[in-house]
UniProtKB/Swiss-Prot annotation:
Organism: Trichormus variabilis (strain ATCC 29413 / PCC 7937)
Stored PANTHER family: CELLULOSE SYNTHASE CATALYTIC SUBUNIT A [UDP-FORMING] (PTHR43867:SF2)
Keywords for the protein's UniProt record, in alphabetical order: Carbohydrate metabolism, Glycerol metabolism, Glycosyltransferase, Lipid biosynthesis, Lipid metabolism, Magnesium, Membrane, Transferase, Transmembrane, Transmembrane helix
Protein name, per record: Beta-monoglucosyldiacylglycerol synthase
Temperature note: The activity increases with temperature.
Length: 468
């Protein structure tokens, strides 16, 4: 990854510490998030107003482009700028990581927040307690977030079997959700590196040996491994998620190769303790702790690396309703961080390359779907093609190219067969059709956040142990 574009004397130590952003954060309930703006610290207040302002600007701007004579020229110019950035992403050469650790291996603390996970928690605990890593150099903490099923009993029995397994039971009064659980256990851990997995994770035995060497570069604050869908063959939705995860990790690696932003994805994330402390831990005022931490790490001038191999397996949701709930949470949390940290972003605190990459991503992922509705309405009223057609075409093309490239990169270690290109093409076409749901999710989320006084309700993803 290229060096950060900020000069050396602009070190993050000379800026306001990021942990001060969270110092006044109050805690919230987990399963139903009902907190209103008045109970939030200043940085996280007024999210609805900010979202409404952005929505107004996007809608009025899109309508104006249909009414002015130079609207088409503006869109072609924007498409050109996005296209140049896209070409850079496509042709970037991924970073080659150091595979061996120089010196002694650091201590690693593995954290899992679990609530009512009786179907999967035993397998995960045994999996994590038998990783290929020197004995005494890692520990496993499972935080039982006041489960009402057999999870506490299962964990109690497993703790007798494995010395490295430690269990923290949270009370019914504990708040903060997953972020609160992770923050509560963090002072009890010893690791220089903190790993976080979901309860349905399936972890490769040599995972730590692949990830830990990446932290030898001092600016690396976190590493995200590729997420793979364990039950990918089940139906259309899980097959689509498999292709989606391939697209996501490909984009992450290509963006970081350009000096852009790597992002955390929750399951399979590894964070340097020093970086986590400097950012103030996990934010308990967000519904997507991983996406929020991504921004704070970059604002604090840390880098995030993304690793294709090995992958962490997880269950994909199997129904359209479950997918809708999950993706709405991801969309709201992802959009929310732009509203929370917009002033620091505009101050270029991340550095020019990262700020530019982030803005290109925001335009494609959030602004374009939001603008699609007024663009379509104006096209119908004025009996003309949608103004945003060129930008939309570029976005879809990048999705197709990235998905095919990601799927092919995953298959690189497999023996080539004559039918492989056709299989990849079929998976890409199916994945592209599946990805259209994001257009509806994003456009509805940005609109809903502008009008609803509450933040999104969190609906627990049920894990059944499928795909094992």
């Amino acid at each position: 990854m290229p060096a950060n574009s900020w000069p050396d004397n602009d070190s993050y130590k000379e800026l306001d510490p990021l942990n001060s952003l969270l110092s006044e954060v109050s805690t919230t309930e987990e399963s139903v998030v009902e907190t209103r703006d008045l109970s939030l610290p200043s940085r996280f207040q007024g999210r609805r107003g900010k979202a409404a302002l952005v929505l107004t600007i996007v809608w009025s701007g899109t309508i104006a482009l249909h009414l002015v004579s130079w609207g088409s020229i503006f869109i072609l110019g924007l498409t050109t700028v996005l296209g140049i950035h896209a070409l850079g992403v496509v042709f970037a050469r991924p970073r080659h990581y150091q595979k061996e650790m120089q010196g002694s291996l650091p201590f690693v603390s593995i954290l899992v927040a679990a609530k009512n996970e009786e179907a999967v928690i035993a397998k995960l605990a045994r999996n994590l307690c038998n990783l290929e890593y020197p004995n005494g150099q890692y520990e496993v903490w499972i935080i039982d977030d006041n489960s009402s099923d057999k999870t506490p009993h299962i964990l109690a029995e497993l703790a007798k079997e494995y010395d490295k397994l430690k269990v923290l039971r949270r009370s019914a009064q504990a708040t903060g959700g997953k972020s609160g659980a992770l923050n509560q256990v963090l002072p009890l851990t010893q690791g220089e590196i903190i790993a976080v997995f979901d309860a349905d994770a399936q972890v490769a035995s040599d995972m730590l040996l692949h990830v830990v060497p990446l932290f030898q570069r001092e600016k690396v604050g976190a590493v995200q491994v590729r997420k793979a869908i364990a039950n990918a063959k089940e139906n259309f939705w899980t097959k689509g998620q498999m292709a989606e995860m391939s697209l996501d990790i490909w984009f992450q690696q290509q963006r970081t190769a350009l000096g852009g932003i790597g992002e955390l994805r929750g399951n399979g994330q590894f964070v340097r303790r020093q970086a986590l402390d400097s950012c103030g831990g996990w934010n308990e005022e967000t519904i997507t702790d991983d996406l929020d931490l991504t921004f704070r790490l970059h604002l604090d001038k840390w880098d995030i690396e993304c690793l294709f191999y090995p992958a962490v397996q997880e269950e994909g949701v199997t129904t359209a309703i479950a997918l809708w709930h999950q993706r709405n949470r991801w969309a709201e949390g992802g959009y929310q961080r732009y509203l929370d940290y917009w002033d620091l972003i505009l101050k270029n605190r991340m550095g020019t390359r990262k700020t530019w990459d982030m803005l290109m991503f925001m335009l494609t992922m959030y602004i374009l779907p939001t603008a699609a509705i007024p663009d379509l309405l104006m096209a119908v009223v004025r009996h003309r093609p949608p103004m945003l057609g060129p930008v939309t075409g570029l976005s879809v093309t990048m999705s197709v190219v990235g998905m095919f490239a990601g799927l092919r990169r995953i298959r690189q270690e497999q023996k080539f067969q004559v039918h492989t290109p056709f299989v990849l093409l079929l998976q890409t076409m199916r994945g592209t059709l599946y990805m259209l749901h994001w257009l509806v999710v994003m456009s509805s989320t940005t609109a809903r956040m502008s009008f609803r006084p509450k933040r999104l309700k969190w609906v627990k993803t049920v894990h059944t142990g499928s795909g094992e």
